[in-house]
């Protein structure tokens, strides 16, 4: 009997604890955010109170955000997940369907068609996996219940509400990733506002359901935010001529060819021009794989600041290039 009462108490406690987490309108930090949105952007307070009154805390968002699988994942394993026959087959189909759109984006923005197709394939398998968590829930959870990155996600929540108003979206219906990224290319709200384009000229910037707009938007992002340099490589394979000590953790090229040789890296191809170079070390199950990165390596990193991600996009793009 005592155990039964304890169990009932625990159930009730968990229920009310979860309810408190979800009752965002009762919290001072949320009230302050609502006041900020009202004062700065003239949002109606009653409207925002209704939105946040129905927003719910998503504990799984916190749980997944706290995981960092890439930190312990080898390049071999990551590449096998991201660049495989299934994804390449889907990429071939996407290219066949949107060849003209990809080429048009390449001509306008200077981004290789295979890079555009690669990013959309890596991000969502060409729209098959776009995320199924309400964006208002994920961003509210991360803005108000994830102190480590609260500042960033508060900005994204602000951008999301502005985006919804500007594009006439219902903010309670949009779904995305655990971090609030949306659509074919998984744009965060600020990227949607700043870089999404109406590439099919139908009057709507729809990267949520329109692959043509997504193609143009990914290209525009890499052109403007990525500062892509046409006719410049992403990376070239390298060999180690001696034991290499720790490599600086950065995405910005900072070395000359001579400096690379001094630390023990030798390119397997001729390096074009007098370019700044980046030594790249990828963990394998045994040893390391070495590459030399260029400015366009940094360009892709502005989409996702992970060297595994950048290299997966690059290698996948090489596989897709034969279909263009």
Name every feature range the model reports, one short phrase each.
Residues 80-217, 223:
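Acidic/His-rich structured neighborhood in mature extracellular/periplasmic domains
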Residues 171-285:
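Flexible, glycine-rich surface segments
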Residues 272-324:
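C-terminal functional modules
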Residues 55-56, 123-127, 181, 241, ...:
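Solvent-exposed loop/turn segments at secondary-structure junctions
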Residues 23-97, 103-106:
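An acidic, Gly/Ser/Thr/Pro-rich helix-cap/linker signature
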Residues 29, 36-40, 47-53, 154-175, ...:
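A contiguous strand-loop segment
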Residues 3-11:
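Sec-dependent signal peptide recognition
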Residues 12, 17-19:
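N-terminal signal peptide c-region/cleavage motif recognized by signal peptidases
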């Amino acid at each position: 009997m005592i155990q039964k009462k304890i169990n009932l108490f625990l159930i009730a406690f968990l229920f009310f604890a979860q309810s408190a987490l979800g009752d965002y309108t009762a919290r001072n930090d949320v009230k302050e955010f609502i006041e900020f949105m009202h004062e700065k952007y003239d949002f109606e307070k009653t409207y925002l109170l209704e939105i946040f009154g129905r927003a719910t805390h998503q504990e799984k968002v916190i749980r997944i955000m706290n995981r960092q699988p890439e930190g312990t994942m080898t390049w071999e394993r990551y590449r096998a997940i991201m660049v495989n026959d299934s994804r390449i087959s889907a990429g071939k189909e996407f290219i066949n369907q949107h060849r003209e759109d990809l080429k048009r984006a390449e001509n306008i923005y200077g981004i290789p068609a295979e890079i555009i197709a690669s990013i959309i394939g890596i991000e969502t398998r060409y729209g098959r996996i776009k995320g199924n968590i309400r964006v208002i829930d994920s961003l509210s959870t991360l803005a108000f219940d994830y102190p480590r990155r609260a500042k960033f996600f508060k900005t994204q929540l602000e951008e999301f509400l502005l985006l919804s108003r500007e594009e006439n979206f219902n903010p309670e219906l949009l779904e995305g990733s655990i971090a609030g990224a949306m659509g074919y290319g998984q744009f965060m709200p600020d990227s949607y506002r700043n870089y999404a384009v109406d590439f099919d000229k139908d009057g709507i910037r729809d990267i949520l359901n329109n692959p043509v707009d997504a193609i143009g938007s990914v290209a525009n992002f890499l052109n403007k935010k990525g500062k892509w340099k046409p006719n410049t490589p992403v990376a070239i394979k390298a060999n180690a001529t001696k034991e290499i000590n720790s490599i600086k953790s950065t995405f910005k090229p900072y070395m000359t060819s001579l400096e690379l040789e001094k630390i023990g890296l030798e390119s397997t191809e001729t390096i074009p021009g007098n370019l700044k170079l980046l030594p790249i070390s990828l963990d394998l199950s045994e040893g390391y794989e070495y590459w030399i990165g260029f400015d366009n390596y940094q360009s892709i990193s502005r989409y996702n600041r992970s060297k595994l991600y950048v290299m997966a996009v690059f290698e996948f793009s090489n596989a897709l290039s034969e279909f263009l």
